[in-house]
């Protein structure tokens, strides 16, 4: 197997970090590589806050649900949906910019942020570092907006740790749903989705058991726990305060 493909297939979230320093030249290379990511209309509507100060990383951990593993990261990168840049560009030539005021525009920002997250983590992984995506930054968006002095049209959507991985005790990466219930030929297939869920429910349960964590929830239980409530209920109001809103008029 191609070495790059092998490395990508072995990717996993790494929460056990040694606390050792990420080399400055490696971090610069990660950022330079991630900046080459594909983005909609070359608008470059993401920005990053790179955090290395230990006290600030501690604050990030506390505001992200008190996740202890974040504190052991040498670097935390906050990924921002950033329409301030594009709005400045259009304002400077007397033009209109509706990117933060349409459903499609907001989706563009979210998609680009996801691509950026993947780019950062892939580059870090190639260099031997461990990462974990942190969606819980959306549990306290207004605190992060204040902490990072974010102007209107900029929003903290997801973050990632970067650090030197400790010895990984897990036998394998987490399994995934069956390929044929994930990648469909020509049309979506609800029956294959249902079949895949049933197969994966057993496989995921077995994986937890094999790795000595039988108390962890199954796939169905995880979905029930996470999505049985509106998890981060200040996202809408905090986005609106930052100038994001739907003003689409359908005709």
Regions found by a protein language model. Give the residues of each.
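Acidic, surface-exposed loops and disordered segments
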Residues: 1-251
């Amino acid at each position: 197997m191609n070495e790059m493909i092998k490395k990508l297939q072995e990717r996993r979230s790494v929460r056990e970090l040694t606390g050792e320093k990420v080399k400055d030249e490696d971090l610069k290379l990660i950022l330079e590589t991630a900046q080459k990511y594909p983005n909609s209309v070359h608008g470059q509507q993401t920005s990053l806050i790179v955090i290395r100060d230990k006290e600030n990383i501690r604050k990030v951990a506390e505001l992200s649900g008190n996740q202890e593993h974040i504190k052991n990261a040498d670097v935390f990168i906050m990924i921002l949906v950033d329409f301030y840049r594009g709005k400045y560009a259009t304002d400077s030539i007397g033009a209109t910019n509706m990117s933060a005021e349409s459903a499609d525009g907001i989706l563009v920002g979210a998609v680009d942020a996801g691509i950026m997250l993947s780019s950062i983590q892939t580059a870090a992984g190639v260099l031997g570092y461990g990462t974990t995506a942190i969606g819980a930054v959306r549990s306290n968006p207004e605190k992060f907006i204040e902490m990072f002095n974010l102007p209107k049209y900029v929003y903290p959507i997801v973050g990632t740790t970067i650090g030197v991985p400790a010895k990984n005790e897990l036998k394998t990466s987490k399994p995934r749903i069956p390929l044929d219930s994930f990648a469909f030929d020509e049309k979506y297939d609800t029956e294959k989705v249902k079949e895949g869920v049933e197969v994966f429910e057993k496989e995921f349960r077995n994986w937890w058991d094999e790795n000595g964590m039988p108390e962890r929830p199954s796939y169905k239980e995880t979905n029930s726990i996470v999505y049985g409530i509106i998890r981060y209920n200040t996202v809408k109001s905090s986005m609106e305060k930052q100038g994001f809103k739907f003003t689409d008029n359908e005709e």
